[in-house]
């Protein structure tokens, strides 16, 4: 998606450790117009998948996830990283390692928000090694739901997440696919 690639070139910062900082428009400050455009693109890409619910992870997946859900006309649920004291019902849980933060989180969704009849579209901000996507897929599978697609705003194709998802048969769409970082610059596929 050219608009997104241009925004990454303009405002993204490559940090040590193959980390791309895009906090000025995606995962700290949010550009709502850009998020709506991303949501429209996800809706276009998955329009024939029969999506009944979007599933994402807090916090950075929420903005693109809600816009995709809005454009598809379906609800969105986000996996929490900490179980609130108000949650007393059954939950689905999965362990997720964060490449950027180098920590493992237990993500959870209340069981009443996912069911076996759901056709889930997983949306997330980044795909690196695929840990968040795998965790979200696990939550959907625990509910007996079918994952009909995975949409990511930015993928680092040089890490293993892309290959894992494709090799396991998931329909993956990345709005910006990074081939590599070279001399502080982003090189797109």
Curated annotation (Swiss-Prot):
Binding site for xanthine: 20, 27, 156
EC number(s) per entry: 2.4.2.22
Binding site for 5-phospho-alpha-D-ribose 1-diphosphate: 128-132
The protein's annotated pathway: Purine metabolism; XMP biosynthesis via salvage pathway; XMP from xanthine: step 1/1
Source superkingdom: Bacteria
Signal peptide region: none
InterPro entries associated with the record: PRibTrfase_dom (IPR000836), PRTase-like (IPR029057), Pur/Pyrimidine_PRTase (IPR050118), Xanthine_PRibTrfase (IPR010079)
Keywords: Cytoplasm, Glycosyltransferase, Purine salvage, Transferase
A GO term for molecular function: xanthine phosphoribosyltransferase activity
Main location class: cytoplasm
Keyword Transferase listed: yes
Gene Ontology CC: cytoplasm
Gene3D superfamilies found in the cross-reference section: 3.40.50.2020
Transferase recorded as keyword: yes
Reaction(s) catalysed (UniProt annotation): XMP + diphosphate = xanthine + 5-phospho-alpha-D-ribose 1-diphosphate
Entry's Gene Ontology BP terms: purine ribonucleoside salvage; xanthine metabolic process; XMP salvage
Described function: Converts the preformed base xanthine, a product of nucleic acid breakdown, to xanthosine 5'-monophosphate (XMP), so it can be reused for RNA or DNA synthesis.
Subunit structure comment from the entry: Homodimer.
Similarity section: Belongs to the purine/pyrimidine phosphoribosyltransferase family. Xpt subfamily.
NCBIfam families per record: PRK09219.1, XPRTase
PANTHER family, per the entry: HYPOXANTHINE/GUANINE PHOSPHORIBOSYLTRANSFERASE, XANTHINE PHOSPHORIBOSYLTRANSFERASE
Name by which UniProt lists this protein: Xanthine phosphoribosyltransferase
Source organism: Lactobacillus delbrueckii subsp. bulgaricus (strain ATCC 11842 / DSM 20081 / BCRC 10696 / JCM 1002 / NBRC 13953 / NCIMB 11778 / NCTC 12712 / WDCM 00102 / Lb 14)
